[in-house]
């Protein structure tokens, strides 16, 4: 029995990046032997064990053979005769097929992963890559993480990904797996690379058709020098990642904010009247299909509906600002306003030539919200108030608090 450190921990160490969880592969052992050493079996589809002291995952070396449709149609063989090289060969990319023997501090790299790391290439290991459609999404997600380091996908791997997209295999992916790869990409510094990669291999139209529909839809060049709405969406996604690193909630809301532009009549292009309202349905549809968590869905719908109101905040009446806060449920969920402000700033700055622009609307929205939030029912003289009068009085008090942050003169809010 011998164990090797494998996968992401080895790859990240060689890249000089912070390593995540340590995964180990065990050669020459069976489940009974692992359990006799105190390891706890946790694998459902293949033998995986938790170390009795560290809790790290140790998987028995295995091979996989395709015997059905989709990413679950595999026969797994995990017995003591499976070699390390055979186990590494079943993996997706060469950079993930490097093992570290810690007993003598050597690397086992049968498929050229170290060289591909040095050349900044994401390359599949073997034709078996095409047997698992999930790997198309994994490649896109890896690009969201690795593109900032200068990585690109090998031409032969792109070709195989296109063939996989054309085969219909991607239709077998369950919504939860698509969401998992999408949401993880939103935690990286360049989530637009996820979208760009999928679109390059014609997979975006299959797994995320609502987002794919934005490409080729023109916007007015005076406001959007990048013109293409799909490109704007990529810029906004990357800007959101810059403004709120690792925040997948904000990232998803930023991703959905302009979905309505794909539904505006062609006759109105490059203008998109009512795209905020039009975007609610595809945002809901996307969220429900992928089984997106409820808090993600709610913030995405808020951003879709309200982003133009935040952009023109200086033109809004005090009572209109209060109504905006109410629609966001901002008095019960105060965190939403700061989140919305970041999404709107990402939208504003996610345009060619506006990357470093100031966006005072975000800070001002937070100030208006803070002023209104500071007022509560306990502050009211409630002796002569009954029933709905209390709520009405509280609303008026909060509107006065909003007004106190600046003077609205019918055209522009001061102190902005």
UniProtKB/Swiss-Prot annotation:
It holds the Pfam family PolyA_pol. Its cofactor is Mg(2+); Ni(2+). Keywords: ATP-binding, Hydrolase, Magnesium, Metal-binding, Multifunctional enzyme, Nickel, Nucleotide-binding, Nucleotidyltransferase, RNA repair, RNA-binding, Transferase, tRNA processing. Its EC number is 2.7.7.72, 3.1.3.-, 3.1.4.-. Catalyzes the addition and repair of the essential 3'-terminal CCA sequence in tRNAs without using a nucleic acid template. Adds these three nucleotides in the order of C, C, and A to the tRNA nucleotide-73, using CTP and ATP as substrates and producing inorganic pyrophosphate. tRNA 3'-terminal CCA addition is required both for tRNA processing and repair. Also involved in tRNA surveillance by mediating tandem CCA addition to generate a CCACCA at the 3' terminus of unstable tRNAs. While stable tRNAs receive only 3'-terminal CCA, unstable tRNAs are marked with CCACCA and rapidly degraded. Belongs to the tRNA nucleotidyltransferase/poly(A) polymerase family. Bacterial CCA-adding enzyme type 1 subfamily. This is Multifunctional CCA protein. It comes from Xylella fastidiosa (strain 9a5c).
């Amino acid at each position: 029995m011998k164990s090797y450190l494998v996968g992401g921990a080895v790859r990240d160490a060689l890249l000089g990046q912070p390593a995540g969880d340590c995964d180990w592969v065990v050669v020459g052992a069976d489940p009974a032997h692992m359990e006799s050493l105190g390891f706890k079996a946790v694998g459902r589809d293949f033998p995986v064990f938790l170390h009795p002291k560290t809790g790290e995952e140790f998987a028995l070396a295995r091979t996989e053979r395709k015997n059905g449709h989709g990413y679950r149609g595999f026969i797994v063989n995990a017995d003591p005769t499976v070699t390390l090289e055979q186990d590494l060969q079943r993996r997706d990319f060469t950079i993930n097929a490097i093992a570290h023997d810690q007993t003598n501090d050597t690397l086992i790299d049968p498929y050229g992963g170290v060289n591909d790391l040095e050349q900044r290439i994401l390359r599949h290991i073997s034709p078996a890559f095409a047997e698992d459609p999930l790997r198309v999404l994994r490649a896109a997600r890896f690009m969201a993480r690795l593109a900032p380091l200068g990585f690109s996908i090998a031409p032969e791997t792109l070709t195989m990904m296109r063939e996989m997209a054309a085969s219909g295999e991607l239709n077998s992916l369950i919504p939860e797996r698509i969401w998992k790869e999408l949401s993880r990409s939103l935690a990286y510094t360049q989530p637009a690379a996820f979208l760009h990669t999928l679109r390059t291999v014609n997979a975006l139209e299959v797994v995320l058709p609502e987002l794919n529909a934005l490409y080729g839809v023109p916007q007015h060049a005076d406001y959007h020098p990048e013109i293409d709405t799909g490109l704007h969406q990529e810029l906004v996604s990357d800007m959101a990642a810059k403004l709120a690193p690792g925040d997948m909630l904000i990232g998803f809301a930023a991703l959905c904010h302009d979905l309505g532009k794909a539904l505006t009549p062609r006759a109105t292009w490059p203008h998109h009247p009512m795209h905020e309202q039009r975007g609610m349905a595809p945002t809901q549809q996307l969220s429900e299909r992928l089984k997106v968590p409820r808090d993600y869905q709610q913030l995405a719908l808020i951003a879709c509906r309200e982003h133009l109101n935040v952009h023109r905040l200086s033109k809004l009446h005090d009572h209109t600002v209060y109504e905006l806060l109410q629609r966001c449920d901002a008095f019960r969920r105060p965190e939403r306003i700061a989140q919305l402000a970041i999404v709107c700033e990402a939208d504003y700055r996610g345009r060619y030539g506006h990357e470093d622009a100031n966006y005072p609307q975000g800070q001002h929205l937070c100030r208006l919200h803070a002023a209104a939030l500071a007022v509560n029912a306990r502050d009211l003289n409630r002796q002569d108030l009954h029933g709905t009068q209390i709520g009405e009085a509280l609303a008026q008090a909060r509107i006065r608090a909003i007004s106190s942050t600046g003077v609205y003169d019918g055209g522009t809010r001061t102190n902005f």
